[in-house]
C-alpha cells in the first residue's frame, strides 16, 4: 500500500547546487568561524536530511506514526513507516485475544490510497521493532543517519563540495579551511606594510599569524580564528610574503630575505629529470638507481602523505655536498617535514654539538637546503652515510654521520691536465661509508674549475674519459654502477638512469650484470 512520498536521497549521484552554497553562506552568518571542507560537507549532509524530514512532515501533516505500543482512537489518521509511509484512518477498535500475550487492542485502518482496510495490534505490551522507528525513517533507511551517509559517501560529497568551493568567487580557502569572502576582516595596505616591517625586524621570520596579530590592532570583538584566517588570506595574496610552515602550522617569512638557494636551484643541482623507460635497464640497475635517491630520477612532484619514518640514511653525493643540500625523494620525504606549501622552514640539530640552525624544504625543486656548514665542519665526502632523524620536538630534524671516523684505503680523485684521475690512498673518513660510492675529494677548488668546463657536455663523453682510471683501481678491471654515478656527478649533474643507459652501448664497456661493467681498452 504505497503513496507518493519524498523518498531517500540518491547520495551516490548527489550534486552540489547553488542552493547548497547559499545555505552554507547563511550558516557562516550565524556562526562566523572558518571550517574545513569535511566540516562543511557534514553540515551539508545534515541539511539535506533535514530537508527530507521537513518534506515528510509536510506530507504527513495531521497524522501520527503507527507504533504497536501506542493507544489510538477512531477517526485518527496514522502513517506507517514500514509500509512506505502509507496513510490511513482508524475506523474501528476491538479487543485482541491471545492468552500468551495479555490484553491488547486491534485497530482497523482504512488506507487512503486504495480504500482497503487492514488490522493492526495496538496497546501491544511486548517489545516490537516498529516501536523503535523514529517516525520519519523507514526500517530500511539507516542511510538517513548522518554518520552512515558520511561513512559510505562522505569522501565523494567532500570532493564535489571542494570543487564547487574552489570555483566559487564567494569563498576563500586558507590551508584546509574555508570562509565567505564578504565576511573576512578587512586588512588594508597599511596592515600589510606593518607585517613586512615586523618580519624584517625578525630577520625575515618565520612568525605565526598569532605572533603578528598584536601589531595590527584588528577589532577585538572578532573571534581569534577569524582574525587569523583573514590575516593568512591577505598575506597569501601579497607576493612579499611566503608561507613556510609544515603541515598543520602557519608560519610567514619575507620572500626577499629567504636564502638565494631557496629561491633558485643551486647550479650544482641543475640537471634534466629522467623521463625515460626503466625497462631498458635490468633489475639490478633499476634497484641501484632507486637506492641512490637522486631527486632527478622521479619527475613527479613530492607531496605530503608519503608516510613517516623515524630515520632515513642517505649516501652523500657531490652535487649536494657542494650545494649544502640533500635530495627530497619519495624515501627521504618520509623524514623531512612536508606541507601544503612549496617551501617549509624548520631547524636542523647536530646532536653531537647541540647546535641548531635553519633548514629549508624546497618541495617544488625537490631538495632540502641548509647543510653546507655542517658538511664542511665534518668534512663529509661523497659516499658517506648521513642520517636524518626526527626529533621529539616538532619542527626539528637531527643530522649525524653514521659510525666513527677511521683511516682507510679509499678512492681519491684529483684534477690533472684537465681530467679527473682516481687512485687508492689512505685517508681519514669521518664516519661509515658505502664502499662502492665513496670518492674522497682532496681539492674541491680544482674540481670546481673542471666543472665549469664539463657541466654542459654529454654524459657519455665524461663516462668514457673516467672509466679507464676507475677500472685500474680493481684487479678485475671492473667499475660498479654506484662508483660511476658518483664519479660522473663530480662534473656533470645526471640521475643514474640515463647514465646507465649510455653505459650499455659505450664502446669498450662490457656489462657483467649485478651493476658491474668491465673496461676493455682494446675495444674502446
Predicted regions and their residues:
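Intrinsically disordered, low-complexity, charged/polar segments
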Residues: 6-18, 22, 113-158
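Basic/aromatic-rich interaction segments and small domains that mediate binding to polyanionic partners
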Residues: 23-31, 91-124
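Positively charged, polyanion-binding regions of nucleic-acid-associated proteins
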Residues: 181-210, 215-219, 234-236, 448-478, ...
Amino acid at each position: 500500500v504505497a503513496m507518493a512520498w519524498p523518498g531517500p536521497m540518491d547520495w551516490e549521484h548527489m550534486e552540489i547546487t547553488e542552493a547548497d552554497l547559499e545555505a552554507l553562506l547563511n550558516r557562516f552568518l550565524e556562526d562566523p568561524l572558518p571550517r574545513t571542507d569535511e566540516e562543511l560537507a557534514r553540515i551539508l549532509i545534515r541539511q539535506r536530511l533535514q530537508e527530507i524530514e521537513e518534506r515528510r512532515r509536510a506530507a504527513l501533516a495531521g497524522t501520527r506514526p503507527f507504533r504497536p505500543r501506542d493507544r489510538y482512537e477512531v477517526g485518527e489518521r496514522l502513517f506507517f513507516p514500514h509500509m512506505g509511509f502509507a496513510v490511513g484512518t482508524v475506523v474501528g477498535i476491538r479487543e485482541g485475544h491471545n492468552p500468551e500475550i495479555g490484553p491488547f487492542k486491534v485497530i482497523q485502518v482504512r488506507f487512503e490510497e486504495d480504500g482497503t482496510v487492514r488490522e493492526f495490534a495496538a496497546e501491544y505490551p511486548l517489545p516490537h521493532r516498529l516501536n523503535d522507528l523514529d517516525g520519519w525513517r523507514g526500517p530500511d533507511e539507516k542511510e538517513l543517519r548522518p554518520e552512515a551517509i558520511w561513512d559510505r559517501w562522505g569522501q565523494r560529497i567532500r570532493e564535489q563540495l571542494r570543487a564547487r568551493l574552489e570555483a566559487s568567487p564567494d569563498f576563500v580557502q586558507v590551508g584546509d579551511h574555508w570562509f565567505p569572502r564578504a565576511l573576512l576582516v578587512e586588512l588594508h595596505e597599511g596592515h600589510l606594510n606593518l607585517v613586512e616591517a615586523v618580519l624584517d625586524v625578525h630577520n625575515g621570520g618565520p612568525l605565526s599569524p598569532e605572533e603578528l596579530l598584536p601589531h595590527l590592532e584588528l577589532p577585538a570583538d572578532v573571534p581569534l580564528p577569524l582574525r587569523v584566517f583573514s590575516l593568512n588570506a591577505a598575506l597569501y595574496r601579497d607576493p612579499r610574503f611566503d608561507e613556510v610552515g609544515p603541515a598543520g602550522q602557519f608560519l610567514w617569512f619575507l620572500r626577499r630575505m629567504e636564502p638565494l638557494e631557496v629561491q633558485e636551484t643551486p647550479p650544482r643541482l641543475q640537471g634534466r629529470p629522467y623521463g625515460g623507460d626503466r625497462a631498458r635497464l635490468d633489475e639490478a640497475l633499476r634497484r641501484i638507481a632507486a637506492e641512490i635517491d637522486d631527486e632527478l630520477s622521479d619527475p613527479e612532484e613530492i607531496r605530503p602523505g608519503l608516510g613517516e619514518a623515524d630515520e632515513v640514511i642517505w649516501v652523500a653525493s657531490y652535487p649536494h655536498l657542494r650545494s649544502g643540500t640533500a635530495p627530497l625523494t619519495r624515501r627521504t620525504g618520509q623524514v623531512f617535514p612536508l606541507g601544503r606549501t612549496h617551501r617549509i622552514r624548520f631547524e636542523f640539530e647536530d646532536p653531537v654539538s647541540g647546535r641548531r640552525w635553519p633548514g629549508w624544504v624546497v618541495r617544488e625543486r625537490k631538495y632540502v637546503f641548509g647543510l653546507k656548514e655542517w658538511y664542511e665542519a665534518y668534512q663529509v665526502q661523497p659516499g658517506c652515510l648521513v642520517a636524518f632523524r626526527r626529533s621529539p620536538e616538532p619542527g626539528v630534524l637531527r643530522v649525524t654521520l653514521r659510525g666513527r671516523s677511521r683511516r682507510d684505503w679509499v678512492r681519491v680523485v684529483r684534477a690533472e691536465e684537465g681530467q679527473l684521475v682516481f687512485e687508492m690512498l689512505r685517508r681519514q673518513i669521518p664516519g661509515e661509508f658505502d664502499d662502492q660510492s665513496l670518492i674522497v675529494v682532496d681539492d674541491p677548488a680544482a674540481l670546481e674549475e673542471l666543472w665549469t668546463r664539463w657541466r654542459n657536455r654529454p654524459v657519455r663523453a665524461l663516462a668514457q674519459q673516467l672509466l679507464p682510471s676507475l677500472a685500474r683501481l680493481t684487479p678485475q678491471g671492473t667499475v660498479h654502477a654506484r662508483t660511476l654515478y658518483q664519479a660522473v656527478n663530480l662534473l656533470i649533474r645526471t640521475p643514474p638512469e640515463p647514465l646507465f643507459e649510455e653505459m650499455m652501448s659505450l664502446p669498450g664497456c662490457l656489462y657483467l650484470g649485478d651493476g658491474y661493467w668491465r673496461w676493455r681498452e682494446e675495444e674502446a
